[in-house]
Amino acid sequence: MLEIFDVSFSLMSNNKLDEVFALRKGTFKDRLDWTVNCINGMEFDEYDNEHTTYLLGVKEGKIICSVRFIEMKYPNMITGTFFSYFDGLNIPEGNYIESSRFFVDRDRVRNLIGTRNPACLTLFLAMINYARKYHYDGILTIVSHPMLTLLKRSGWRISIIQQGLSEKQEKIYLLHLPTDDESRYALIERITRITNAESEQLTTLPLLVPLA
């Protein structure tokens, strides 16, 4: 069983925070070589604070995937870290949340689930379910070109708001991730193909996915 649930920074145990931060270091520093701050084998920044909520994907008690949410009214990576990478950033008005630090740990997924796994798709779906549960207008995020491709292939009806250049002079994109029914059920259809889940099981949060 793969379980994905939301938990606020303030309610996270130190052990779970350390686990998330260590996994993030493995993804963003070791594998992707992003310019991130790492201390004692962990990656974290000023946006990991009392305004932050995490989605955690857990299999057999171990975190295998996660994403970070911050309401746009609070300091976040779009209005902070990434702002200068765009020429006059055009941020939509509305009740949006920002997502960042999306990762699926390849080694843990391979060991706990196998190569044919729904972790990435399920985390995408959990993001939609979270935004709908708490009545947000949608999700805003900044992604690299490979992540843009992954999102497009998932069936999520994303839209590009603006293109910028990272510190490495690589294309990055400000995206709107909608929470519409069509996107939701496109993801659900793909997940049910490779798991034992029924469609009606996949519209909630926490999200429980029986694996094939």
Swiss-Prot record:
Reaction catalysed by this enzyme: a fatty acyl-[ACP] + S-adenosyl-L-methionine = an N-acyl-L-homoserine lactone + S-methyl-5'-thioadenosine + holo-[ACP] + H(+)
UniProt keyword terms in alphabetical order: Autoinducer synthesis, Quorum sensing, S-adenosyl-L-methionine, Transferase, Virulence
EC number: 2.3.1.184
Presence of keyword Ribosomal protein: no
Enzyme class: transferase
GO biological process entries: quorum sensing; signal transduction
Family matches, as Pfam families: Autoind_synth (PF00765)
GO molecular function terms noted in the UniProt entry: N-acyl homoserine lactone synthase activity
S-S pairs: none
InterPro entries, alphabetized: Acyl_CoA_acyltransferase, Autoind_synth_CS, Autoind_synthase
Family classification: Belongs to the autoinducer synthase family.
Function: Required for the synthesis of OHHL (N-(3-oxohexanoyl)-L-homoserine lactone), an autoinducer molecule which binds to ExpR and thus acts in virulence (soft rot disease) through the activation of genes for plant tissue macerating enzymes.
Protein name, per record: Acyl-homoserine-lactone synthase
Gene name linked to the record: expI
